[in-house]
């Protein structure tokens, strides 16, 4: 029920002119990196405002949003997921970390990666083994490689550059 309400609110806030510009900017044409993604033309502040109303959506509903080909739905799902993560105990943070990793195929554009991975993957790994980042760094998938690097921002903020430098070397090879 809440999921349908959210989708309805997104459609009500759509802007076809902005959507067309976003489709071009995010390279959604055939053969481009964002191929097949649909944009509703909602600006980021508005998406964040809408997301705040739906922070109680469960992981199953967030999975449905991430599986959508509507980019704005994915974006909102990640904003909500980051909010849940930030306000959770260690057990729930682990669940959200695992959920994120299990849904990497759907985190498939640079803005989706950049708004979320360092706040979830990076933050979770600050005091843990970071092997998963090295696995992502050697992936064939562009977005997994980007996640491996951007997640390091959480470490860099704590003056820990070691993994960022190692991963950057992997990525430039």
Label the model's feature ranges.
Residues 1-173:
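Alpha-helical scaffold domains
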